[in-house]
Amino acid sequence: MDIKSLIRNIPDFPKPGIVFRDITTLLGHPEGLRYTIDTLTQKCIELNLRPDYVIGMESRGFLFGVPLAYQLGAGFIPVRKPGKLPAAVHTIEYDLEYGSDKLEIHQDAVADHHRVLIVDDLIATGGTARATADLLAKIGCEVLGFAFIIELKDLGGRQKLPDLPIITLVDY
């Protein structure tokens, strides 16, 4: 199935010159959504990625991370922006092109012996995915790899990530 045809392209959003890759059309297509999750699952199995937890990056990583975790027999844990999680958190600050940002995960969500797979809808510059991996490594988790639906190849995000398996289904 060609899931690229199910992803809507919105020019000049959120600002002029940017083409936004809108996955809501993929999510709304039952066969496309099933194919996407089944394909991610199959690729994880082929690469022998057997996580204890799938880590979903805020917020579209939640949409693909939960069903993937279910398919892999793993738990699901969200990594969120500051102030979104109610209990004690581990935090990492990371640099953006202009400034910095933070990510958080509950302190009791994972431990140093857990094997994790990081999931998001898209990899662009790789900064957020790298920060998520660094946060989990700081806790002591074993990061097994990454899974994304879309890769924006010209932005070079893959090069910022650790030398681990990276699954992508569509590239632009």
Swiss-Prot record:
Its main location: cytoplasm. Keywords: Cytoplasm, Glycosyltransferase, Purine salvage, Transferase. Its EC number is 2.4.2.7. GO terms for cellular component: cytoplasm. GO terms for molecular function: adenine binding; adenine phosphoribosyltransferase activity; AMP binding. It is found in: Cytoplasm. InterPro entries: Ade_phspho_trans, PRibTrfase_dom, PRTase-like, UPRTase/APRTase. Pfam families: Pribosyltran. GO terms for biological process: adenine salvage; AMP salvage; purine ribonucleoside salvage. It catalyses: AMP + diphosphate = 5-phospho-alpha-D-ribose 1-diphosphate + adenine. It is an enzyme of class 2 (transferase). HAMAP family: Aden_phosphoribosyltr. Catalyzes a salvage reaction resulting in the formation of AMP, that is energically less costly than de novo synthesis. Belongs to the purine/pyrimidine phosphoribosyltransferase family. NCBIfam families: apt, PRK02304.1-3, PRK02304.1-5. Homodimer. This is Adenine phosphoribosyltransferase. The gene is apt.
